[in-house]
From Swiss-Prot:
The gene is ifitm3. This is Interferon-induced transmembrane protein 3. Belongs to the CD225/Dispanin family. The keyword Transmembrane helix applies. The modification Phosphotyrosine is found at residues 20, 27. GO terms for biological process: defense response to virus; host-mediated suppression of symbiont invasion; negative regulation of viral genome replication; response to interferon-alpha; response to interferon-beta; response to type II interferon; type I interferon-mediated signaling pathway. Polyubiquitinated with both 'Lys-48' and 'Lys-63' linkages. Ubiquitination negatively regulates antiviral activity. Lys-24 is the most prevalent ubiquitination site. Phosphorylation at Tyr-20 is required for endosomal and lysosomal location. Keywords: Antiviral defense, Cell membrane, Cytoplasm, Endosome, Isopeptide bond, Lipoprotein, Lysosome, Membrane, Palmitate, Phosphoprotein, Signal-anchor, Transmembrane, Transmembrane helix, Ubl conjugation. Its main location: membrane.
């Protein structure tokens, strides 16, 4: 409030503070105050587990299964990813993390070996194509 409105309120009430009616619940709370007697105060502590996100790598495993399934590593990674997702749904975060770690390693292995096989195949085809005219003569 600014200064002029305070003067108006004080003049309207005759200089006395306004008389507020006390709410019943407010009155009862102030009357009760602190607990009386020898009853001990009990506190309850609730431990809320923090939200832990365990990646299950299902999409990556599915991609490797469909497109880069070198020696069935993508399929095995997909199986471990599904196991990881199942463990996460049950609430076993340690088990889910272990399965997810295995799925991640298998996915990396499948990806690297498949890319190496593609590169080796391309290099082999190029070398054969470049040497083909020499072989015909």
């Amino acid at each position: 409030m600014n200064h002029t409105s305070q003067a108006f309120v004080n003049a309207a009430t005759g200089g006395q503070p306004p008389n507020y009616e006390r709410i019943k619940e407010e009155y009862e709370v102030s009357e009760l105050g602190a607990p009386h007697g020898s009853a001990s105060v009990r506190t309850t502590v609730i431990n809320m587990p923090r939200e832990v996100s365990v990646p299950d790598h299902v999409v990556w495993s599915l991609f490797n299964t469909l497109f880069m399934n070198f020696c069935c590593l993508g399929f095995i990674a997909y199986a471990y990813s599904v196991k990881s997702r199942d463990r996460k749904m049950v609430g076993d975060m340690t088990g889910a993390q272990a399965y997810a770690s295995t799925a991640k390693c298998l996915n990396i292995s499948s990806l690297v070996l498949s890319i190496l096989m593609v590169i080796i195949t391309i290099v082999t085809v190029v070398i054969i194509a470049l040497n083909a005219p020499r072989l015909q003569t």
